[in-house]
C-alpha cells in the first residue's frame, strides 16, 4: 500500500499528516481483489507486534487504483476527498461497512523492529564492555593485594611491631594486647638489636661464613620477626616433643624462610635503583614494564599482565640456592641470639613481697634419643625448649602468627614447568620431592608436551573458586568460644593431672606415675589440636569477607594432587569442609534437590550412607522437622545435626535444604554446596579393575546392585565369625581363645575399616595392630594396656587373614608388583615408572647419609639422600605407590573432562565434588574416565618398561586376569556414591 507518511526509526521522529476538513470514519472498500489482499501479510495481525502502539495515520488517497485497499470517508464532501473511476455498488452500503485502523506494510514494521534490535544489541554491548572494565578493575585490585601479601608479609609485620611500640609508649596499650603478642613485642627490640650488633661486628669473613653466613642480607628488624614467628609456628604445630622443637628442624626452617625473603628483598632493592637511574626525559609510557611494576616497591606490582615479566627478571638474576648447610648455620645463630635475648615474666603477685620472676623464654638443651634394643649406644639431640609460661597462652592466640601460602585472591599462575606456576611470587614447585634430587631431575627432564595433561588438571583444580560459609563459621565460633568439645572440636581445657596419694605402696606410686605420664601426653595432644584448630579458624576469619579465593595445587611424588595451603582446605577435617563452599552458586534443579538430600543422608552416616538412594531419600523425608530445626536453631534447638558423623558438613546441608524447602520454587534455589561422590574402598576398586576379577569387582561396586556393597561390613562379619570360632576352643591348647572371648561383640565395621582401607596400600601387621588398638581404646572396654596390646595383635592377624581370603586376585597383583620392585632394588636402582598421564615417578627410598656441620649453637647432623637404595622399602612401598599414581591419574582425567563440560570440580583423591545440579553429569564423566583408564594395558606397559630399562634382569610373569567386563562400571550406580 502506498503511503506518504514519513517514518524514521528514531524515537523522536515526527508524524506529519494532511489536514482534513471534517471528522470522518474510515471504511474498507469491498472489492473482488480485496479478498486476495486481505490474506496478505500487510493485513495479517501476526505481521506486527500486538503490543506496539503506533499513531493513527491520516493519508491522502488521491490517485489510488481500484485494486488497492482504500480507506475513505462517508461524509458529505466525499467527492472532494476521493475521485474513483469506478466505485463498487456495495461501497456505500452502510450495513456492510466496517470500521478499521490503518496497518503499515511489513517492511515498515520490519524496519522498526530491526532498529529496536540494533539498539538493544548496542546497549548490551556497552553493558558487556562496562562489565568487562569492572571485572578487570576488580581483578587488578585483587592482584595488587595478592602480590602485596606474598612479598610484603614480613615487612608489614615489622611495621606492626614498630607501631605497637609507639602506641605502647604513648598510650600504654600493653595490657590490652593478646598474651603472645605481648611476648613477641617484648622480644622484638632486644633481638633486633642483637642481630644488628652481629651484622656490624668486625668479624673475619671466615668466621662469619662458618657461623653466621648471610646474616647481613636482610634488615635486622625483618630478620628478628622471621625468627620469632617461625619458631613459635613450629612450637604450635606440635610434634613428638613436648614444648620443644629439634634444633635441626628449627634452624633449617628459619634459614629457608630468610633465604626466600632475601630473594624478594634484593629484587625490590635492585628495582628501586633502576627507578633512580632513569632519565628525566623518559616518559611514563616509555618506562619498561618491569620498572612500572616495581615503582614504589611492591605497590608498583599492580599493573595487569606484568608479573610474568617480573618473574623472568627475578629468575634471571637469582643467585644459587644457599643449601641446607648454610641455612642451618644461619638458623642456628639466629636461634642462639633469640635464646640470649628473649625473657618471660610470671604475673606479679601483688600480695607477695618478692622480686619479679624473670627467666629465659627458651632454652637450648639436649635430650637422649630412644635407645635401640640390644645396643648400648646413647644418642643425644639438641632441642629448643619453650618455657611453660609461653605455652600457656600460645593455643589461644595463634591468630597473631603469620601464616604463609594462604589461599590466593586471584587464580594461580598456570603451570608451565617444575617451578613455573602456582603463587605469583612465593616459591612454588610442581612436586613435593622432599629433597629427592632424582625425582626433581626426572620431572625437569620431561618435555612440556608430555606433562600437558598434568598441568591442565592442576590448573583446573586451582581455578575452582571457594568462599567461606559464614553461617557455619558463626556456629563454629560460638562453640569454640564456649570451650569446644562438641561437634568434633577439641576441648579447650586440659585434663587434670592426678595427685599423688599419701600411700607408701610402691605399686600405687608406679600406677600414679603411669597416670601422670598418660595425662601429660593427652594434654600435649590437646594442645596440638587446639593450635591446629586456631590456625584453621584464623585463616577462615581473614577470608570470610572475601568474594572468593583459590587454592594452588601441586603433586606428591606419586601424582596425587594437594592444595599448597596446609590449614584451611577441603582435604582437611569436617571443620574445614563445613566452612568451605563454592563461590559460584547454581540453581538446584530437580536432580540437584534429589542429590542434596542424598548428600545430607550420607553425611549423617551411622549406617545410612550404606542404604540405597531411595532409602536415603526416605531417611531425609522422615527427619524434615529435625533438619529445619537444625538449620534455624543450630545451637538452641534439638541439635539433631550433632549426631552426624560429619556434623558441620551435615549442618551446611541442612541449611541449604531448608532454604530450598522454604522457597515457593525449590528447584530454582541457588546452591553453593559441594556434593560429594566417594569411591567405595577406592584402592580395591583399582585393584579389581587391574585384575578384572568379577567377585572383587562386585564387592567394591564396580557392578550394578540394588544397594551399595559394603566391603568393610563383609570383612567385619568374617572376622567376627573367626573370633567366635576361636572363643570356644580350649585355652590350654589355643592361647587365642581368651583373647577371642574378650573381643566378642566388639568387632564391627568401624573396627576393621581403616585396616581394610589401607591394606591395598601396603599396611603392615604393625600398622594394622596400631589401627585396631586405637579403635579398641575408643570403645573403652579393655582397661589393661598389656591386655589391650595382645588383643590388638590377635585382631590384626585375623583381619589380615580375612582380607587375604576375600581379595586373592588383588593380593596376587600386589605380590607381582612387589616382586618386580625387589628385582630392581637388588640392583641398587630405585623403582621408576611413568603414569598414564605422562608423569615420571622415582621412588625416593635411599639410605641416608649423615653430614655433620659445626654451628654457633651446637654440632648438627644433617641427613641427605645417599646412593644406596633401601631394598625393603622399595619393595613394600611400590604396590601402594603405583595404585596411588593410578587413582591420581583418574582424578586428574575427571577434572579436565569436567572443566571441558563447564562443571566446577574439586577432588579429594577418591572423592569428587561438584554442584548438586551437575552430579549426574559428573557421575557419567568419572565412570567414562575410569573405563578409559583401565582399557589401557597398564600392567603390560609397566612390565615392558621394566624390561627395556633393565634388559639383563628377569621379571616374574604377569598375574592372570579375570573376565570382568569393565563397561559394567558405566551402569553401576554405587561405583562412586
UniProtKB/Swiss-Prot annotation:
GO cellular component: chloroplast; mitochondrial DNA-directed RNA polymerase complex
Subcellular location, record wording: Plastid, Chloroplast
Transit peptide: 1-71
Any Gene Ontology biological process: mitochondrial transcription
Alphabetized InterPro entries for the sequence: DNA-dir_RNA_pol_helix_hairp_sf, DNA-dir_Rpol_C_phage-type, DNA-dir_Rpol_phage-type, DNA/RNA_pol_sf, RNA_POL_N_sf, RPOL_N
Gene3D superfamilies linked: 1.10.287.260, 1.10.287.280, 5' to 3' exonuclease, C-terminal subdomain, DNA-directed RNA polymerase, N-terminal domain
Record SUPFAM superfamilies: DNA/RNA polymerases
Top-rank EC class of the record's enzyme: transferase
Catalysed conversion reaction: RNA(n) + a ribonucleoside 5'-triphosphate = RNA(n+1) + diphosphate
Enzyme Commission numbers on file: 2.7.7.6
Highest taxon in the source lineage: Eukaryota
Alphabetized GO MF terms: DNA binding; DNA-directed RNA polymerase activity
Entry keywords, A to Z: Chloroplast, DNA-directed RNA polymerase, Nucleotidyltransferase, Plastid, Transcription, Transferase, Transit peptide
One Pfam family it belongs to: RNA_pol
Residue numbers annotated as active site: 678, 753, 910
Protein family: Belongs to the phage and mitochondrial RNA polymerase family.
Main function: DNA-dependent RNA polymerase catalyzes the transcription of DNA into RNA using the four ribonucleoside triphosphates as substrates.
Name of the protein in question: DNA-directed RNA polymerase 3B, chloroplastic
Species per Swiss-Prot/TrEMBL record: Nicotiana tabacum (Common tobacco)
Amino acid at each position: 500500500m502506498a503511503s506518504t507518511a514519513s517514518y524514521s526509526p528514531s524515537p523522536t521522529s515526527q508524524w506529519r499528516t494532511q489536514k482534513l476538513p471534517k471528522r470522518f470514519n474510515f471504511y474498507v472498500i469491498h472489492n473482488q481483489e480485496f479478498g486476495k489482499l486481505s490474506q496478505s501479510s500487510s493485513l495479517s495481525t501476526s505481521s506486527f507486534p500486538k503490543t506496539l502502539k503506533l499513531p493513527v495515520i491520516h493519508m491522502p488517497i488521491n490517485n489510488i487504483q481500484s485494486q488497492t485497499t482504500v480507506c475513505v470517508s462517508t461524509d458529505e464532501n466525499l467527492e472532494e476527498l476521493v475521485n474513483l473511476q469506478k466505485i463498487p455498488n456495495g461501497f456505500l452500503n452502510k450495513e456492510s461497512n466496517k470500521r478499521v485502523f490503518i496497518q503499515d506494510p511489513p517492511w515498515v514494521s520490519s524496519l522498526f523492529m530491526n532498529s529496536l534490535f540494533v539498539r538493544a544489541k548496542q546497549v548490551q554491548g556497552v553493558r558487556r564492555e562496562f562489565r568487562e572494565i569492572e571485572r578487570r578493575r576488580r581483578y587488578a585490585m585483587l592482584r595488587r593485594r595478592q602480590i602485596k601479601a606474598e612479598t610484603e608479609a614480613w615487612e608489614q609485620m615489622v611495621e606492626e611491631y614498630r607501631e605497637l611500640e609507639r602506641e605502647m609508649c604513648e598510650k600504654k596499650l600493653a595490657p590490652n594486647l593478646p598474651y603472645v603478642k605481648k611476648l613477641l613485642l617484648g622480644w622484638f627490640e632486644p633481638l633486633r638489636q642483637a642481630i644488628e650488633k652481629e651484622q656490624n661486628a668486625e668479624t673475619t669473613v671466615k668466621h662469619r661464613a662458618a657461623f653466621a653466613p648471610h646474616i647481613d642480607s636482610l634488615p635486622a628488624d625483618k630478620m628478628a620477626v622471621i625468627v620469632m614467628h617461625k619458631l613459635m609456628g613450629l612450637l604450635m604445630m606440635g610434634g613428638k616433643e613436648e614444648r620443644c622443637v629439634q634444633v635441626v628442624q628449627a634452624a633449617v626452617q628459619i634459614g629457608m624462610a630468610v633465604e626466600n625473603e632475601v630473594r624478594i628483598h634484593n629484587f625490590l632493592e635492585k628495582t628501586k635503583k633502576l627507578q633512580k637511574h632513569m632519565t628525566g626525559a623518559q616518559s611514563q609510557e616509555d618506562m619498561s614494564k618491569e620498572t612500572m611494576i616495581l615503582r614504589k616497591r611492591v605497590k608498583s606490582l599492580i599493573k595487569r599482565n606484568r608479573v610474568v615479566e617480573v618473574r623472568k627478571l627475578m629468575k634471571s638474576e637469582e643467585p644459587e640456592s644457599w643449601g641446607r648447610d648454610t641455612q642451618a648455620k644461619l638458623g642456628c645463630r639466629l636461634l642462639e641470639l633469640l635464646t640470649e635475648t628473649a625473657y618471660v615474666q610470671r604475673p606479679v603477685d601483688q600480695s607477695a613481697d618478692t622480686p619479679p620472676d624473670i627467666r629465659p623464654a627458651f632454652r637450648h638443651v639436649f635430650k637422649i634419643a630412644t635407645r635401640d634394643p640390644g645396643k648400648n649406644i646413647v644418642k643425644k639431640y639438641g632441642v629448643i625448649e619453650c618455657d611453660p609460661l609461653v605455652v600457656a597462652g600460645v593455643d589461644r592466640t595463634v591468630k597473631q602468627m603469620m601464616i604463609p601460602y594462604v589461599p590466593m585472591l586471584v587464580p594461580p599462575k598456570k603451570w608451565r614447568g617444575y617451578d613455573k606456576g602456582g603463587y605469583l611470587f612465593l616459591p612454588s614447585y610442581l612436586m613435593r620431592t622432599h629433597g629427592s634430587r632424582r625425582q626433581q631431575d626426572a620431572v625437569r627432564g620431561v618435555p612440556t608436551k608430555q606433562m600437558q595433561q598434568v598441568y591442565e588438571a592442576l590448573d583446573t583444580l586451582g581455578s575452582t573458586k571457594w568462599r567461606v560459609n559464614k553461617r557455619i563459621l558463626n556456629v563454629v565460633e560460638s562453640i569454640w568460644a564456649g570451650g569446644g568439645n562438641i561437634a568434633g572440636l577439641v576441648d579447650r581445657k586440659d585434663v587434670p593431672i592426678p595427685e599423688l596419694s599419701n600411700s607408701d605402696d610402691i605399686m600405687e606410686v608406679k600406677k600414679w606415675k603411669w597416670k601422670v605420664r598418660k595425662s601429660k601426653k593427652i594434654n600435649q595432644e590437646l594442645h596440638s589440636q587446639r593450635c591446629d584448630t586456631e590456625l584453621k579458624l584464623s585463616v577462615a576469619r581473614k577470608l570470610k569477607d572475601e568474594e572468593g579465593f583459590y587454592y594452588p595445587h601441586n603433586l606428591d611424588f606419586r601424582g596425587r594432587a594437594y592444595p599448597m595451603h596446609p590449614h584451611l582446605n577441603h582435604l582437611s577435617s569436617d571443620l574445614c569442609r563445613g566452612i568451605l563452599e563454592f563461590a559460584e552458586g547454581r540453581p538446584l534443579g530437580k536432580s540437584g534437590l534429589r542429590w542434596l538430600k542424598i548428600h545430607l543422608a550420607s553425611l549423617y552416616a551411622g549406617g545410612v550412607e550404606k542404604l540405597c538412594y531411595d532409602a536415603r531419600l526416605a531417611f531425609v523425608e522422615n527427619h524434615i522437622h529435625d533438619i529445619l530445626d537444625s538449620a534455624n536453631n543450630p545451637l538452641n534447638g534439638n541439635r539433631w545435626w550433632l549426631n552426624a558423623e560429619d556434623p558441620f558438613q551435615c549442618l551446611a546441608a541442612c541449611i541449604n535444604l531448608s532454604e530450598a524447602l522454604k522457597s515457593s520454587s525449590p528447584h530454582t534455589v541457588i546452591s553453593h554446596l559441594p556434593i560429594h561422590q566417594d569411591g567405595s574402598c577406592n584402592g580395591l576398586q583399582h585393584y579389581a579393575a587391574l585384575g578384572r576379577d568379577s567377585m572383587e569387582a562386585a564387592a567394591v561396586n564396580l557392578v550394578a546392585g540394588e544397594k551399595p556393597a559394603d566391603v568393610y561390613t563383609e570383612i567385619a562379619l568374617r572376622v567376627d565369625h573367626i573370633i567366635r570360632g576361636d572363643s570356644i576352643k580350649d585355652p590350654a591348647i589355643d592361647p587365642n581363645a581368651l583373647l577371642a572371648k574378650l573381643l566378642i561383640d566388639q568387632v564391627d565395621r568401624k573396627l576393621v575399616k581403616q585396616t581394610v582401607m589401607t591394606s591395598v596400600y601396603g599396611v603392615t601387621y604393625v600398622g594394622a595392630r596400631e589401627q585396631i588398638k586405637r579403635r579398641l581404646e575408643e570403645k573403652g572396654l579393655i582397661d589393661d594396656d598389656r591386655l589391650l596390646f595382645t588383643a590388638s595383635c590377635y585382631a590384626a592377624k585375623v583381619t589380615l587373614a580375612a582380607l587375604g581370603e576375600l581379595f586373592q586376585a588383588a593380593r596376587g597383583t600386589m605380590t607381582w608388583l612387589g616382586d618386580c620392585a625387589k628385582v630392581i632394588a637388588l640392583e641398587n636402582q630405585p623403582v621408576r615408572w611413568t603414569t598414564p598421564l605422562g608423569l615420571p615417578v622415582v621412588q625416593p627410598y635411599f639410605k641416608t647419609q649423615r653430614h655433620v656441620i659445626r654451628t654457633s649453637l651446637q654440632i648438627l647432623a644433617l641427613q641427605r639422600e645417599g646412593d644406596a637404595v633401601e631394598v625393603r622399602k622399595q619393595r613394600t612401598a611400590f604396590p601402594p605407590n603405583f595404585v596411588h599414581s593410578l587413582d591420581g591419574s583418574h582424578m586428574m582425567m575427571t577434572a579436565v573432562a569436567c572443566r571441558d563440560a563447564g562443571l566446577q570440580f574439586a577432588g579429594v583423591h577418591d572423592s569428587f565434588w561438584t554442584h548438586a545440579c551437575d552430579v549426574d553429569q559428573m557421575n557419567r564423566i568419572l565412570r567414562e574416565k575410569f573405563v578409559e583408564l583401565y582399557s589401557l594395558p597398564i600392567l603390560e606397559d609397566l612390565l615392558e618398561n621394566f624390561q627395556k630399562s633393565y634388559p639383563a634382569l628377569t621379571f616374574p610373569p604377569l598375574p592372570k586376569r579375570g573376565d570382568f567386563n569393565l563397561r559394567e562400571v558405566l551402569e553401576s550406580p554405587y561405583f562412586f556414591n
